[in-house]
Amino acid sequence: MIVKILSSNDTGETGGHQAGILVPKKSELLDFFPKLNSSTKNPRTVMTLSDEHGEGWSFNFIYYNNKFFGGTRNEYRLTGMTKYIRSNGLKAGDEIHFSKDNPGYRLKSKKNNVSEGPIKLTGSWITVKTKI
């Protein structure tokens, strides 16, 4: 199982646009996801996941590798998650738990209610505004 703690950028709270949730290039994370053919430009696959209510969700796992094809990007992303995040009312600090289940993938959300505003990151310090 892997867990993604959502940032305000992941949830759209910053108002910015990003091309999906960044998946760090760590083997323990990448081994969880389907294998992609890195010899092709921007390989991707559709992942079908079931949530704790039995509802199916489709996300795209993409390796933006155009750096090796004349571009600038070299990163993995999980895209197509906006509807899931919004329908579950997820905010910065909440979690999405991903697990493998025969024959596919499962996910579940966990609301942490840690913040009334965006989590502010400054260097290695994290300031969290908690509810009293």
Describe these PLM feature segments.
Residues 1-132:
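Acidic, low-complexity intrinsically disordered regions
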